[in-house]
Every structure is written in structure tokens, then in C-alpha cells.
Amino acid sequence: NLVQFKTLIMKIAGRSVVYKYFYGCYCGWGGIGQPRDATDRCCFVHDCCYGKVTNCNPKTATYSYTEENGALVCGGDDPCKKQVCECDRVAAMCFRDNKDTYDNKYWFLPPKNCQEDSEPC
């Protein structure tokens, strides 16, 4: 769920999730246009991942995970919730791996700057 996603971003990327809201064309609710940088692409890929989840709502599904040898491992018996966890885990690692691409000019980017056709997932 979105609360757990926020927690994973802090655990894995070491950054507050506030930096990911209203960023670029995809970080936040919804998304259109072309991702503006690698950080925005992390959000695009996360949106695509959520779009492929079936049998539960990824924004509200509560999943389980453990930390093993410094790595986060998604667990539980529900395949849908495990898929949501994987979406969140991969996105948090993407944010971590692309920290240096974050650019304040894309924070609160006006929607008029995201008018291009979206690429397919």
C-alpha cells in the first residue's frame, strides 16, 4: 500500500517520500507524457507495475516483507500482495540508484509540460 511504499523508500533510498510527490510527469497521482529524468522514469515504471497487478488494489493492499542481510525480501502467501511489494521494492531501489538525477526544476512541474503521448509500459 502507499504507506508501506513510503516506508520502503525511506529504508532503501534513504530519502523522504515528499520529494517523490508532484515530481516530473509521473511521481504522484496518475501520469501522462514522457518521463523527464531517471527519477521520473522510476515513477513511470512503478505506475506500469501497479497497472499489471490483478486481484487486489495495489494502493491499499497490505503486504509483508523481511530484511535479510541488508536486502528487503517480499513475502507472504498472497501472490497479488507479493507482486505489489515487488513493485514498491524495485521502485525504491530505482530511487536509490538514481538519487543524483533528482532535479528541483521538476518538482511541481506544471501539467502543461507533460502533454506528449505516453510511451507504452
From Swiss-Prot:
Compartments, record wording: Secreted
As annotated in Swiss-Prot or TrEMBL, what is the tissue specificity of this protein? Answer: Expressed by the venom gland.
Catalytic activity from the UniProt record: a 1,2-diacyl-sn-glycero-3-phosphocholine + H2O = a 1-acyl-sn-glycero-3-phosphocholine + a fatty acid + H(+)
Alphabetical GO CC annotations of the entry are: extracellular region
Q: Which GO terms describe its molecular function?
A: calcium ion binding; calcium-dependent phospholipase A2 activity; phospholipid binding; toxin activity
UniProt-listed InterPro entries: PLipase_A2 (IPR001211), PLipase_A2_Asp_AS (IPR033112), PLipase_A2_dom (IPR016090), PLipase_A2_dom_sf (IPR036444), PLipase_A2_His_AS (IPR033113)
Coarse class of the protein's main subcellular location: secreted
Homology family: Belongs to the phospholipase A2 family. Group II subfamily. D49 sub-subfamily.
**Entries under PANTHER family matching the protein:** PHOSPHOLIPASE A2 FAMILY MEMBER, PHOSPHOLIPASE A2, MEMBRANE ASSOCIATED
What name does this protein carry? Answer: Acidic phospholipase A2 SpII RP4
| Source organism per UniProt | Bothrops alternatus
